[in-house]
């Protein structure tokens, strides 16, 4: 009953008419983007939960050499309080030199836990190989790992991943094309020719004719002032213009792993009749002991005895007339007591029969 209520409520919610949206809610300015940074470093100060992998030892020796410490030849350091880690961060657009960003630290070796560790100075590089930030600091780890003397182990959450809030300082800014050219381009999050044209029409209605033009299903180009300060004020105005996005294409999204089914607003069915029955095959393997008669010279053996039981649920047939909506489809399927897996099978069969007006996407 709860499943039926949730499905019907979700369908009704999706069927509500679209509301006006601000431009910044459905699009982003081209060139105004974040960048990914990554680096390799060492976490020290671990309470014996580190590692002794070859690359960790090599990195540890290189660090000592940078500090002017040369180990005797053949010396193998014990690095159970050290772990090799990968450090990654996201550099937001317009982040300035000297500002700080959050980082995530992940073990890449056999360390059991990073709890209590400190990340040493680590260079964070971009795709071009340049250093844009430097990370360092004490980790905050949500998980834990405990090992007993008898080898028993208890692990909670993920102890090999930690975060450092404001753990990296930006040393170099990323060039941004925001202040260049005569136009600003807005890229829709969901490509749609109708929505792109409506966005351009809304800007032209607000600012004047020929100020905006839809380039394709994703991009809308808007004429903007060259002066940077005026451009900021101009963008602040444009991104708050409201318009009515177009209704998207009719789609049914099915997640075969979780059983989640999302049906879009415009999905309809052509005339069709459906019957769906469930068959269950149960195989039970029993073992019996065959005991020979006394003094017969036979051997005691174990003989398998299989029991196979087949049960089939009563199937019902229901018919859809032209123009049936998604709500009626869900109600009809729920009335026959179908589970989400049954609904997925029905939807796939309807699509193969050409009875669904829309896309069926299985993820």
From Swiss-Prot:
GO biological process, any: bacterial-type flagellum-dependent cell motility
Domain of life, per lineage: Bacteria
Signal peptide (residue range): 1-20
One MF annotation (Gene Ontology) recorded for this entry: structural molecule activity
One GO cellular component term: outer membrane-bounded periplasmic space
Keywords: Bacterial flagellum, Periplasm, Signal
Entry's localization field: Periplasm; Bacterial flagellum basal body
Oligomeric form and interacting partners: The basal body constitutes a major portion of the flagellar organelle and consists of four rings (L,P,S, and M) mounted on a central rod.
Known function: Assembles around the rod to form the L-ring and probably protects the motor/basal body from shearing forces during rotation.
Family classification: Belongs to the FlgI family.
NCBIfam families, alphabetized: PRK05303.1
Protein name stated in the entry: Flagellar P-ring protein 2
UniProt source species: Photobacterium profundum (strain SS9)
Gene: flgI2
């Amino acid at each position: 009953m709860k499943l039926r209520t949730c499905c019907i409520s979700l369908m009704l919610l999706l069927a509500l008419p679209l509301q006006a949206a601000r431009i910044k809610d459905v699009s982003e300015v081209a060139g105004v983007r974040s960048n990914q940074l990554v680096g390799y470093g060492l976490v020290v100060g671990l309470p014996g939960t580190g590692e002794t992998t070859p690359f960790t030892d090599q990195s540890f020796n290189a660090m000592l050499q940078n500090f002017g410490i040369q180990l005797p030849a053949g010396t193998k350091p014990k690095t159970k309080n050290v772990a090799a880690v990968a450090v990654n961060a996201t550099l937001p657009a317009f982040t300035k030199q000297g500002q700080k960003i959050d980082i995530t630290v992940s073990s890449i070796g056999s360390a059991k836990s990073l709890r209590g560790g400190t990340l040493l100075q680590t260079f964070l590089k971009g795709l071009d190989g340049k250093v844009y930030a430097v990370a360092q600091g004490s980790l905050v780890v949500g998980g834990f790992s405990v090992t007993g003397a008898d080898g028993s182990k208890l692990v909670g959450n993920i102890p090999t991943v930690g975060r450092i809030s404001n753990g990296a300082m930006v040393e170099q800014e990323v060039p941004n094309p925001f202040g260049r050219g005569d136009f600003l381009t807005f890229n829709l999050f969901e490509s749609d020719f109708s929505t792109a044209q409506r966005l351009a029409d809304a800007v032209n209605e607000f600012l004047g004719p020929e100020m905006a033009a839809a380039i394709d299903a994703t991009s809308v180009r808007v004429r903007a002032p060259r002066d940077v300060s005026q451009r900021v004020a101009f963008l602040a105005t444009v991104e708050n213009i409201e318009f009515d996005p177009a209704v998207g294409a009719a789609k049914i999204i099915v997640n075969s792993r979780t059983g989640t089914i999302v049906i879009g607003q415009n999905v309809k069915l052509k005339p069709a009749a459906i019957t769906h029955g469930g068959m269950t095959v149960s195989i039970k393997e029993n073992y019996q002991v065959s005991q020979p008669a006394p003094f017969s010279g036979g051997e005691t053996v174990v003989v398998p005895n299989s029991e196979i039981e087949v049960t089939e649920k009563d199937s019902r047939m229901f018919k859809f007339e032209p123009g049936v909506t998604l709500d009626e489809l869900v109600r009809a399927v729920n009335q026959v007591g179908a589970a989400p897996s049954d609904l997925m099978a029905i939807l796939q069969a309807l699509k193969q029969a050409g009875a669904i007006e829309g896309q069926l996407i299985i993820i």
